[in-house]
Amino acid sequence: MPKFDAVVIGAGNGGLAAACRMAKGGKKTLLIERHNMPGGCASSFRRGRFEFETALHEICEWGTKENPGGCRKTCEEFGLDIPWHMVPDNFRVITTASDGKTHIDATLPCTVKEFVDEMERLVPGCRKSIQDLFDLGTEFHAAGDYSLSVAGKTDPKYMQEHFPNFLRLGSYTVNRVFRAMKMPKLAQDIMNTYWGYLGVDADHLSFLQYVNMLWLYVNHGAWIPDKTSNELTTGLLECFRNMGGEVWMNCTATEILFDESKAVRGVKTTCGDVETKHILCNMNQNMVYATMCPPEVVPERMVKLGNARTYSARMFVVYLGLDRSAEELGIRDYTVFLPTSANTAKEYESGKTIATNCNQVMVCYNVVNPGFSPEGTCVVSLTSTFMDDDWANVDPDDYVETKTAFAEKLIKLFEERYGVTVTPYIEELEIATPWTMCNYVNVPQGAAYGFELKDWDNMMPRMMMMGTEFPVKGRKFVGAASIRGDGYNSAIFSGDTLAKKTLAEMKAEEA
């Protein structure tokens, strides 16, 4: 039986970061991936002459070489060096305000000053509340950096002295704090646009998590790799190999092995058994506990926690390869949010069923990267999120008809709301549903976002409870369902943070 210092199961963003950190720490590390390529959701696929980005709209916390964000620093520390494109604006949103009457069409730029100035132009009198929001974001980001630097073992007194608002506001929701800041309602509607990126309505979404994400996008901009997410994840895989890591592709981890004390002793795979005392799983915890562990080693607390949590957003994506350029079609924006209403609670409820869900985000990659597809063409994706498991109610015999009808609805709504025509120019079309995510990424209900970051179960308590979040000796979880929640940068940070924690535990064991 081959022996490794650590085994990483799953080569998604979190797993790749964890594997790279373990290898960089000098540990003999094995990375197991059931597919023939890395990435999980962070990948690409081809149809005809088009290569489609599977999932990424834009990555935050990247930044420039001169002013890098934390995510870029981490990946470049591993040796990643690939070309990137910066998205010129943060987003455009076209919708109806929560009052049900006012039309919103707003494009928000990068940099805090320009963002605040544009918000003041759109909603006179909101300047102070928006500026205060970014000031809080600066404090929150600094608090997050401090927590990462000490692997979650924060000093309460230091936190109280340096990050009082982080502690004071950490348990509150977005809308509650917006109201307390006396932010005008129309400004709240616009500022809530990014809620879909975290999959929780603003009445329940963690203010800390949301503002931190917004601050990162505005300060460091949004970025995409030159050749889709596949370039990012294959690049990280190459970094891992260059540091001496071993990779088993087309290999499925089927069972985690334990010793008499219920500590990890190895992994059973379709390629044979492996001996190790440390496993980092880039998988949903519920899947691991239910299918890869004997019941007697699963702590009762983790069963209760799994039942208490709510699965987050389930993706539905329409991929369009169009035989006209973005300019010819009149598509000028990279990202456009197209909800029916700025009332996030209403949109969240509507997103629970196929019949009522009309929310979507349009991305046109060629606006930022003209060479993304062949000359004279462009690639557009329309993404909708489901907030409940309504696709489980679809009869398999009706699946193709149901997904096709919903895709046609999204295309029609996009044309109406954005004011362009794309249907006659569709050369290639592919559809991904929550079932697709279940099949390819092995996530329950297709919930690629992991668990909802809301109320008691947001990033702050997860980070603070890191010590009890992983009670089984030798096993930790990384990725979207882990401590940081969803998002490429969050998944990468979770892998890096928990690998560092594992390295520290190894050092203590050796002492």
Where are these predicted regions, by residue range?
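Mid-domain catalytic core of redox enzymes
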Residues: 254-374
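Active-site-proximal substrate-binding core of FAD-dependent oxidoreductases
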Residues: 258, 504-511
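C-terminal segments that line or cap access tunnels to active or ligand-binding sites in enzymes
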Residues: 325-435
